Amino acid sequence: MAFLKKSLFLVLFLGLATLSICEEEKRETEEEEYNQEEDDKSEEKRFLSLIPHAINAVSTLVHHFG
């Protein structure tokens, strides 16, 4: 009977340890995804801020050569 208790405690301990590791990896993955989304948003903002400058440059060229 004592052997079964020890085995059960071992199984429960290993299960909890595995669950803890999985939760930590999940949190890290979610954090990396969030950081990637933030990087993508900042790149998009930088790109969108260049559009007015490009339009001004094109309009200047059109007025100069047109």
UniProtKB/Swiss-Prot annotation:
Family in the record: Belongs to the frog skin active peptide (FSAP) family. Phylloseptin subfamily.
Species source reads Pithecopus hypochondrialis
Signal listed as a keyword: yes
Q: Name one Pfam family in it.
A: FSAP_sig_propep
Query: Where does the protein principally reside?
Result: secreted
What does it do? Has antimicrobial activity. No hemolytic activity.
Q: Does the keyword Secreted apply?
A: yes
Tissue expression profile of the protein = Expressed by the skin glands.
Q: Which gene encodes it?
A: psn2
- InterPro entries, per this entry? Frog_antimicrobial_propeptide (IPR004275), FSAP (IPR016322)
One cellular component term from this protein's GO annotations in UniProt: extracellular region
BP GO terms, sorted? defense response to bacterium
Q: Which residues form the signal peptide?
A: 1-22
Q: What is this protein called?
A: Phylloseptin-H2
Keyword terms, alphabetized: Amidation, Amphibian defense peptide, Antibiotic, Antimicrobial, Cleavage on pair of basic residues, Secreted, Signal
Q: Where in the cell is it found?
A: Secreted
Where Phenylalanine amide occurs, the residues are F65
Which residues make up the pro-peptide?
23-44
